A protein has these predicted regions:
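Active-site neighborhoods and metal-handling regions in enzymes and metal-associated proteins
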Residues: 1-377
């Protein structure tokens, strides 16, 4: 195993948060060198790191930070020098770093004789299999998803038709209002809401349209929720689609096909299953029903109808991470947490998507999501 270096903070660096499960807002160095696992860190953070991890701690003060501050040089230069001194203290002369490693810091270390090699795959693999704490955080975030959607569905059920729009308690029922209700529930569950999707009508056919405006009768409403557990920094991800009123025959067909695709692809999830093969299974279902996918379109065609996105992705310290289930697919391993999210769309009209969160286990899989799929809210 090569020596490793990661520099950043545990709020923005998933690679670092996986190794140091403590919320630290300022940049610091994590190193694996010669069998040692250590952090080079400010004294302010030492008590929590000592309490919550078994990492070796090298304090900035041990490396001469007081003398560096007395020189009056810029803080970024002090940080670079402390990282260099930390590397020398730990015996690092050559190391692998993630793609997020700061370019300026990398140049500085190389200029001082430390060889660095970016190894994206190495760091992605290290956090593929979720540890016990990360899984607990994902499950908490998923429970928050379900509670938030419960609250939103209650508003949909109470909605009254006013023309072709929907009102609740005499006020228009909008995407923004539904989001606020969900955000309140998320706050109660100690998760961060992020930029959730509550889209409706033609918006639902536009990839990652966050949604806005008044909800209308008989149109699809897509809820794609991906809150982050504050304790661990881990995400969940779930999508459901509803219609207040009477869904069209087209939407009913989409729902039947998408649910079939979800069930059949999820059934194949196990260690060694390939993400591309699962994607092809779903594309076959949709293509057999006459829909376009990325596999049967014309070369160079920009697809706006049918099934135009991947089947899923990994979820953990990032809401989108490895493995991939799409035209590029990875073999699944025990401990992967993935989404399975087939959908069908027609530009200018709408779309329908269902998404579950699935844990790959030694014996096969576990569907973490525990929520109904009906179109009626």
């Amino acid at each position: 195993m090569p020596d490793l270096l990661i520099w950043g903070d545990t709020i923005r660096s998933p690679e670092l948060r996986h190794e140091v499960p403590v919320t630290i807002p300022d940049g610091f160095l994590y190193a694996e060198a010669g069998g040692r696992r250590a952090v080079v860190i400010h004294a302010l953070e030492i008590p929590r790191v000592r309490m919550e991890t078994d990492l070796e701690i090298v304090a900035h003060e041990q490396l001469g930070s007081d003398e560096l501050f007395a020189l009056g040089i810029p803080r970024w230069q002090i940080d670079q020098e402390l990282v260099l001194r930390g590397c020398r203290e730990l015996g690092v002369v050559e190391a692998a770093v993630p793609a997020s490693f700061p370019v300026g810091l990398a140049d500085f270390l190389r200029d001082h004789g430390i060889e660095l090699r970016v190894d994206r795959e190495l760091f992605d693999r290290r956090r593929r299999a979720k540890n016990e704490a990360e899984l607990a955080g994902i499950r908490r975030a998923q429970k928050a998803c379900e509670a938030g959607l419960d609250a939103a569905r209650e508003l949909l059920r109470r909605a009254q038709q006013d023309g072709d729009g929907l009102d609740v308690d005499g006020e228009p029922l909008t995407s923004e209002r539904l989001k606020r209700v969900i955000e309140d529930v998320f706050a109660d569950h100690d998760v961060e809401a992020g930029s959730m999707i509550v889209s409706h009508g033609p918006q639902t056919a536009v990839g990652h349209d966050l949604g806005s405006g008044q909800i209308h009768v008989d149109e699809p409403v897509v809820f794609d929720l991906f809150p982050k557990d504050k304790q661990t920094g881990c995400y969940a991800d779930m999508t459901r689609t509803y219609v207040v009123g009477e869904p069209s025959d087209e939407v009913k067909e989409w729902h039947r096909l998408v649910k079939e695709a979800l069930d059949r692809s999820t059934a194949e999830v196990k260690p060694g299953a390939n993400g591309r093969a699962l994607y092809e299974l779903v594309c076959d279902i949709f293509q057999s029903a006459g829909y376009k996918t990325q596999l049967n379109k014309e070369p160079g065609e920009v697809l706006e109808d049918g099934f135009f996105h991947g089947l899923g992705h990994g979820v953990g310290l990032e809401v989108h991470e490895g493995p991939s289930l799409g035209r590029i697919g990875h073999d699944l391993i025990p401990g992967d947490v993935i989404t399975v999210e087939p959908g069908l769309y027609r530009a200018g009209y709408g779309g329908l998507r269902l998404e579950d969160l699935v844990l790959v286990t030694e014996a096969g899989h576990e569907v973490i999501t525990d929520y109904p799929y009906e179109l009626e809210p």
